[in-house]
């Protein structure tokens, strides 16, 4: 099975040079094929993409700046908000392949607005699970210490999503 190094310093607290990890890691991990690059350091991402004549696959992990990662050469994206607005991301991928930056930016803004709402409600796990429930997929409550959503919060979340036309995406 292919192995990808999951680079997400904002959550793990581990911030190492990914390019060096890929080169040295490949010596010890034969099935290392790339990284899920969840960081906004696009300079470092570009170095990883160019390593050894594109030897490693770089998957972009920041939903709200996907077009930047694709423009740098990421081969794909992996993100939590793809679960509830997949058509937005498909439109970004398709329009980037066709060099239609206007459409890509239009859809990227939808992603950004969605992420802003999620952050307002406690971030990816808490806000994301609540959105999944609102679209009809109940993934259950978050584990402690993350507080479950109250009925009032669900109503406010729905209102904020309505304000950005989320249910029309």
Sequence positions of predicted segments:
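Glycine/proline-rich, positively charged
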Residues: 1-57
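Broad hydrophobic/π-residue packing in well-ordered secondary structure
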Residues: 6, 56-59, 92-93, 109
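Short, ordered loop/turn segments at secondary-structure junctions
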Residues: 8, 63, 82
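Short linear motifs at secondary-structure transitions and domain/linker junctions
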Residues: 33-35, 52-55, 60, 68, ...
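Small/polar loops that bind or transfer phosphate-bearing groups
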Residues: 36-37, 61, 80-81
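Anionic-ligand binding region
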Residues: 42-45, 56-77
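Structured C-terminal cap/extension of enzyme domains
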Residues: 67-169
């Amino acid at each position: 099975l292919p192995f990808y190094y999951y680079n997400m310093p904002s959550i793990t607290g581990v911030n190492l040079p990914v390019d060096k990890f890929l080169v040295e890691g490949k010596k010890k991990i034969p099935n290392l094929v790339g990284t899920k690059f969840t960081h906004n350091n696009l300079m470092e991402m570009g170095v990883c993409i160019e390593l050894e004549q594109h030897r490693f696959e770089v998957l972009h992990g920041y939903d709200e700046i996907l077009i930047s990662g694709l423009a740098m050469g990421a081969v794909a994206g992996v993100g939590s908000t793809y679960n509830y607005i997949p058509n937005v991301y498909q439109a970004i991928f398709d329009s980037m392949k066709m060099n239609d930056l206007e459409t890509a930016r239009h859809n990227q803004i939808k992603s950004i607005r969605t992420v802003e709402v999620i952050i307002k409600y406690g971030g990816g796990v808490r806000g994301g699970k609540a959105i999944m429930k609102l679209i009809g997929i109940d993934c259950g409550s978050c584990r402690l210490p993350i507080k479950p959503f109250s009925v009032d919060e669900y109503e406010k979340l729905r209102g904020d999503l309505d304000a950005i036309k989320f249910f029309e995406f």
